[in-house]
Amino acid sequence: FGSLLGICLATQIITGLLMAMHYTADTTLAFTSVAHTCRNVQFGWLIRNLHANGASMFFICIYLHIGRGLYYGSYLFKETWNTGVILLLTLMATAFVGYVLPWGQMSFWGATVITNLFSAIPYIGQTIVEWAWGGFSVDNPTLTRFFALHFLLPFIITGLTLVHLTFLHETGSNNPLGIPSECDKIPFHPYFSIKDILGFMAMLLPLMSLAMFSPNLLGDPENFTPANPLVTPLHIKPEWYFLFAYAILRSIPNKLGGVLALAASVLILFLIPFLHKSKQRTMTFRPLSQLMFWILVANLLILTWVGS
C-alpha cells in the first residue's frame, strides 16, 4: 500500500496544481471559481472529481497501510512508524483545510465546528481560535490562509515521505512471518515494479469508476449550496474518512473531553510500539491478538457508520 500512497500523493499534487490555477481564494469568488473550473475548463470536471475522490482513495490506502502495519508488527521499526503517524496527521490536516476551499455550506460549517474545538483548550483556547480565524468568525482571512496551507502541506507530506522511506531503508521491510528476509532479497525491477503496477491498476479502476460514474457519491449535497453564515445545515458532518473520530467527539458530552478523545483516537498510534509484549512480531500465529485486531477494525467501521 505504500507504493499506492505514493501514487495517490503524486496524483493529488498534479490535479491540485491544475485546480489551483483556476481557483480564487476569496469568499465571494471561491464557490463560483470551482463551478467555473467544472464547467468551462478543459476536463476541469474530471480534474476536480479525481482530486475530490483521490482524497478518499488516499485515506482508504493509508488506513489499510496502518492496519497492515498493526497486524504484522511493523511498528517495531519505531522511527519508520512514528514518521508514518506524523504523515497521517499531516494528511488529515491537509484534507481538512482542502475541504473548506470550495466554500459550500458544509465547507464553511465544518471549518467553523472543527476550528472551534481549539477553544476547549483551557486559558489560551479562545485566543488560538481567533488567531486561526484571523477575526471573530470564519471569513475571508480564514479561507485565504487555508488555501495557503492546503498548497503547502502536500509538499511537506512529500518531504516526510522521503524521511519515512529513508528510515525504512535502514532496516529493510517486514514480512508476514516477522523473520529476517536477507536471503530472499530480489531485484526491485522487474519483480516489485510489476507487482506495484498491479496495485496501481487495482486502485485506478475504482478511482476512475468513481470519478466518472458517481463523483458525488461520497460528498455531501449541502456543499452544492454556497456558504451562508446565517443558515446552519441540519447535520454538520465531515467527509467519511473522519467520521470515526467525529463520532468519538460527539459521543462525549464535555467539550474538552471530546476533543481529547478525538485527539487520542489517532495519537494512540504513537504508543503502539511500547505496548508490544509478545515474543512473536506478527499476528500470523496469535489467534487472540487477531481477534482483538478484527474487533478494532469492526469498531472503527461501526463508528464510521454511526458518525454518519
UniProtKB/Swiss-Prot annotation:
What would be one Pfam family of this protein?
Cytochrom_B_C
- Is Transmembrane among the key words of this record? yes
What is the membrane topology here? Multi-pass membrane protein
Check the record and name the InterPro entries matching this protein. Answer: Cyt_b/b6_C, Cyt_b/b6_C_sf, Cyt_b/b6_N, Cytb/b6-like_sf, Cytochrome_b_C_euk/bac, Cytochrome_b_N_euk/bac, Di-haem_cyt_TM
Transmembrane residues, as ranges?
A: 1-21, 45-66, 81-101, 146-166, 194-214, 256-276, 288-308
Q: Which domain of life is it from?
A: Eukaryota
The cellular component terms of Gene Ontology attached to this UniProt record, alphabetical and capped at eight, are: mitochondrial inner membrane
- Presence of keyword Transmembrane helix: yes
**Gene3D superfamilies recorded:** Cytochrome Bc1 Complex, Chain C
Question: Where, in this chain's numbering, is heme b b566 bound?
Answer: H65, H164
From the Swiss-Prot or TrEMBL record, give the protein name: Cytochrome b
Q: What is this organism's lineage?
A: Eukaryota, Metazoa, Chordata, Craniata, Vertebrata
Q: Which gene encodes it?
A: MT-CYB
